[in-house]
From Swiss-Prot:
Gene name linked to the record: tgt
Protein family: Belongs to the queuine tRNA-ribosyltransferase family.
Identification of the protein by name: Queuine tRNA-ribosyltransferase
Annotated region described as RNA binding, given as residue ranges: 247-253, 271-275
Enzyme class: transferase
Subunit structure of this chain's protein: Homodimer. Within each dimer, one monomer is responsible for RNA recognition and catalysis, while the other monomer binds to the replacement base PreQ1.
Cofactor note: Binds 1 zinc ion per subunit.
Molecular function per GO: metal ion binding; tRNA-guanosine(34) queuine transglycosylase activity
Cofactor(s) listed in the protein's UniProt record: Zn(2+)
Length: 373
């Protein structure tokens, strides 16, 4: 099987939906947040811990795994699931975003992208066909088309030309994809331009994919601009296919994205800020390494029931982070991922009760106020 997507409920006051995404490695309740495991590991977390916090699917990075240890080695190991001992669903990105982030080290051609490795300067080439080959060897349940990712801001003409190439590449990706146990998603581009987003959606629907992602957001544009693009893009997307907003993971953005009809999200934010001693709480972000928490013997978030908040204090975690102890990063990462996955569970509950706007208002009132931190 590849995947199937069933819509279970549409919220009456918003565009939010409840869905069930079926994959060869299990079912996913949407809307969902996907922890990022760039190097075939969610940094500092074991697969058992990810299951404990109810992670349903994780994301890995094609670019990094292509460079190290190599997709052929992972294929030899039986694919990503066996290699990393994670038997639930996996999504791999195409590597496009990372390659196009190497602005001084890459050259774009119609056939693909030539680039130099950020590790050792070695020269490489990735085409749409190569990106699909790598992802077929990695063996994820959901894989992504290879797209061109314009920087923000970019002028209209550049984005228009880039979009046309992305559509041509999407066709090549679909033609190259041969694994029936994988689903290939197309990626909508078009920058902040309404007509280009519309053009992108229509072209990808014409090619035909089992799911569609919104790319090119959360790349430096203002929050209001991102929401505006979602407002005019999501309604154009097929109702009966999963909708994936790439690279978005701040709690407030997850809520707003779901309200606009998005089903899937991923972001390195929760794990990245955790490594620097910042955590999500019901009252907003908290930087536990700050001196004010040296003698604070309360949990990171008194309203959280995760393992970390039940067993450790801000003072202790601050001590670990300041001393650069590995356990400190493990605890902050565990808490942050639990916080987001728990938030998504609450969002799904609110959609079921047709009460998402009330949930949003109450959540943001506390989260953005930060009065008690």
């Amino acid at each position: 099987m590849s995947i199937s997507f069933n819509l279970l409920h549409r919220e009456i006051n918003t565009r939010a939906r409840l869905g069930k995404l079926k994959t060869p490695h299990g079912d996913i309740d949407t809307p969902i947040f996907m922890p990022v495991g760039t190097q075939a590991t969610v940094k500092s977390m074991t697969p058992d811990e990810l299951e404990n916090i109810k992670a349903q699917i994780i994301l890995s990075n094609t670019y990094h795994l292509y460079l190290r240890p190599g997709s052929s080695l992972i294929d030899e190991a039986g694919g990503l699931h066996n290699f990393m001992n994670w038997q639930k669903p996996i999504l791999t990105d195409s590597g496009g975003f990372q390659v196009f982030s190497l602005s001084d080290l890459r050259e774009i051609k119609e056939e693909g992208v030539y680039f130099r490795s950020h590790l050792d300067g070695s020269r490489h080439f990735i085409s749409p066909e190569k990106a699909i080959q790598i992802q077929m060897e990695l063996g994820a349940d959901i894989i992504m088309a290879f797209d061109e990712c314009p920087p923000y801001p970019s002028d209209y003409d550049y984005v228009a030309r880039s979009l046309e190439r992305t559509v041509r590449w999407a066709r090549r990706c679909k033609k190259a994809h041969e694994r029936e146990d994988q689903a290939l998603f197309g990626i909508i581009q078009g920058g902040v331009y309404r007509d280009l987003r519309k053009q992108s959606v229509e072209a990808l629907i014409d090619i035909g994919f089992p799911g569609y992602a919104i790319g090119g957001l959360s790349v430096g544009e203002e929050k209001e601009k991102m929401l505006e693009v979602l407002d005019f893009t999501v309604p154009l997307m097929p109702e009966n296919k999963p909708r994936y907003l790439m690279g978005v993971g701040a709690p407030e953005d997850l809520v707003e994205g779901v309200i606009r009809g998005v089903d899937m999200f991923d972001c390195v934010l929760p794990t990245r800020i955790a490594r620097h001693g910042t955590v999500f709480t019901s009252q907003g972000r908290l930087t536990v390494r700050n001196a004010g928490y040296e003698r604070d013997f309360t949990p990171l978030d008194p309203e959280c029931d995760c393992y970390v908040c039940k067993n450790y204090t801000r003072a202790y975690i601050r001590h670990l982070i300041k001393r650069k102890e590995i356990l400190g990063v493990r605890l902050t990462t565990y808490h942050n991922l639990y916080f987001l996955l728990s938030l998504m569970e609450k969002i799904r509950g609110a959609i079921k009760e047709d009460a998402l706007l009330e949930f949003r208002d109450e959540f943001l009132r506390k989260y953005l106020n930060k009065a008690s931190i």
